[in-house]
Each structure stands twice: as structure tokens, then as C-alpha cells.
């Protein structure tokens, strides 16, 4: 009877450990990045970091770490846009920021397939966003 109780307790504890969802994950601040100071700076960072992400193919442990570090700069760039744009462009920046946070968490926790899926979503959204910031006069400020 004591073995049964111990076994059931162990099972319940292990289920509890596995029941945590991704929505409860909180990122760990590993890197402090300065806020963006201009549209030109935010644009440059966004385009360069997107290019760096696009170069990642293997998504091994090293690349996942690099992706994780890239997300810090992307988060700052998107925060600048979310604060300084309006309308559709602002909404798109906010939507992309949510995906970047998902990439951040997945790469930080070495989840290769989740990271790949979130990156795919990111690249779809970022194409429209890059086109909008490239064609706007915002980058001249």
C-alpha cells in the first residue's frame, strides 16, 4: 500500500511538472539593449536582425542561442515602432512583437521546431512591415 501511495504521489508530481504551458513562461533578461533613438536606427536594426535570422538554417543549439540574442534588438526596434507609429503600421509592429517574444522564448528553451514555426510566421509578417518602412518617409527622421 505504501508503494502504491508513493507511486501515485510521484505520478501526480510529474504530471504537475509537465502541465506548465508556454503561456506561463517568462523570458530571462540576458542582455540589455539600448532603446532606439530614431526611425532610421529602428529600421536599420530591424532589417539587419531580420537578415541575420533569415541566415539561420540548422537551428542547432548554437543557432538557437544566436536567435535568442537577436530577439533582444528586435524587441527594442519593434517597441520604438509601436510607440511612434499609428494605425495599421503600429498594429503590425505590435503583432510582430508578439511573434518575436514567442521566438525569444522558444529559442531560449532550445525548442527547435517551435522556433522554426515562429520564425516562419515572423518572416511572413516582416515582409509587409519592411516594405512599409522602406517606402515611407519615416526612415528619414
Feature locations, PLM:
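Sec-dependent signal peptide recognition
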Residues: 2-10
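Short helix-adjacent coil turns
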Residues: 62, 103-114
